[in-house]
């Protein structure tokens, strides 16, 4: 049983690595507010379809 078999073999149920973007699957820069669960890059590209308006 080598290192590559053991690394990330146990599922994560808590912490930042357990939550993924619902669009692309990325775990970095995640926006969880209002239950979006979307990374910031996907949020910027889909904000208008979701219903967010940029005022400035």
Swiss-Prot record:
It comes from the Eukaryota. The gene is RPS29A. Zn(2+) binds at residues 21, 24, 39, 42. Belongs to the universal ribosomal protein uS14 family. The keyword Membrane does not apply. Its cofactor is Zn(2+). GO terms for cellular component: cytosol; cytosolic small ribosomal subunit; plasma membrane. One of its GO terms (biological process) is translation. Binds 1 zinc ion per subunit. Gene3D superfamilies: 30s Ribosomal Protein S14, Chain N. GO terms for molecular function: structural constituent of ribosome; zinc ion binding. The keyword Endoplasmic reticulum does not apply. Keywords: Metal-binding, Ribonucleoprotein, Ribosomal protein, Zinc. This is Small ribosomal subunit protein uS14z/uS14y/uS14x.
């Amino acid at each position: 049983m080598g290192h590559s078999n053991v690394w990330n073999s146990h599922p994560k149920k808590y912490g930042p690595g357990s939550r993924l973007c619902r669009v692309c699957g990325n775990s970095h820069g995640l926006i969880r507010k209002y239950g979006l669960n979307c990374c910031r890059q996907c949020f910027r590209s889909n904000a208008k379809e979701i219903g967010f308006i940029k005022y400035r």
